[in-house]
């Protein structure tokens, strides 16, 4: 498609969706990279997860997708079941090197053989120093050439893949992923790889986001929002679709998530020994609120299309959700 036609299509979708044109362009890049990832030789070992899956796969939130979270099957590195601290350290290194070398190499080759070739640069996250020599999860940055001259502060022309092997992969389902351009203007075909994408179930993502907020708000780790307010928005929007009803009472799924986090991604200061649902904390402490409010306002203007509930409404929703968790045995 000629450049002027690309601009015209993106601007048309931006008008319809009430989103910045740069957001529509980035969604197209995010979608294309997801499709390419699940057409790679290593695709069978990957699972698409996180907040982006809620919009791209399940249509549960009206939040523009910014990054791509991928879980890597630990079996690739010959690790299964519960691991010792020593094994986890080895797994983190193996996973980090896999992303830096293998995933980066395969993705770079796929881009070279796709219509995206010549329009972006693929850069792996560099090694760190000391204990952070091998970051895990590790990032791959895809820096693309925007067809628009003006930029937005909250949106950069970069797609971020974050991949690691410490994630809980199941349950998942295979789905197809499309762009906002294709769903808004069905006559336009923008698919770069016709693939199915193994994607975490929404109920699992719901519970993981709730657990993450508890880990942030029950410790000092949530003092600065740092682009995390989207988790509150995501939970609130999923509540409007009724996801919480089945998720909160799914004892088997919750227990698998809590057990997994206690071993592989535990946060210092968080008690994993008893059912966290009984005391889960989903509302930021008063001293955290200003940071989270500012982060949400910044994010909402650039990344939310459709309903944009105010921050107070989100917090009210989290209070309701807290009570539902605390009373899960009575449901």
Model segments located where?
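Structured mid-to-C-terminal alpha-helical surface segments
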Residues: 1-46, 56-62, 68, 74-331
């Amino acid at each position: 498609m000629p450049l002027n036609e690309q601009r015209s299509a993106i601007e048309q979708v931006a008008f319809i969706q009430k989103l910045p044109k740069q957001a529509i362009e980035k969604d197209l890049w995010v979608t294309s990279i997801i499709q390419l990832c699940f057409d790679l030789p290593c695709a069978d070992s990957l699972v698409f997860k996180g907040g982006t899956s809620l919009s791209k796969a399940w249509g549960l939130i009206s939040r523009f997708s910014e990054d791509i979270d991928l879980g890597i099957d630990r079996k690739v590195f010959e690790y299964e079941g519960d691991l010792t601290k020593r094994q986890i350290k080895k797994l983190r290194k193996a996973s980090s090197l896999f992303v830096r070398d293998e995933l980066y190499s395969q993705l770079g080759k796929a881009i070279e053989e796709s219509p995206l070739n010549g329009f972006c640069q693929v850069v792996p996250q560099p090694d760190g120093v000391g204990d952070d020599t091998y970051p895990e999860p590790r990032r791959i940055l895809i820096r693309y050439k925007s067809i628009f001259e003006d930029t937005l502060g909250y949106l950069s022309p970069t797609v971020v893949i974050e991949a690691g092997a410490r994630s809980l992969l199941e349950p998942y389902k295979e789905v197809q992923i499309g762009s906002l351009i294709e769903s808004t203007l069905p006559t336009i075909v923008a698919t770069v790889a016709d693939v199915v994408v193994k994607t975490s179930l929404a109920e699992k993502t719901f519970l993981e986001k709730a657990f993450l907020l508890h880990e942030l708000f029950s410790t000092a780790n949530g003092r600065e929002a740092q682009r995390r307010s989207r988790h509150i928005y995501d939970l609130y929007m999923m509540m409007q679709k009724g996801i919480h009803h089945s998720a909160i009472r799914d004892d088997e799924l919750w227990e698998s998530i809590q057990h997994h986090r206690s071993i592989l991604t535990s946060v210092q200061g968080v008690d994993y020994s008893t059912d966290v649902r009984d005391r889960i904390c989903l509302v930021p402490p008063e001293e955290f609120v200003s940071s989270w409010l500012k982060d949400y306002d910044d994010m909402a203007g650039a990344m939310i299309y459709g309903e944009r509930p105010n921050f107070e409404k989100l917090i009210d929703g989290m209070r309701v959700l807290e009570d539902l968790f605390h009373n899960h045995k009575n449901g």
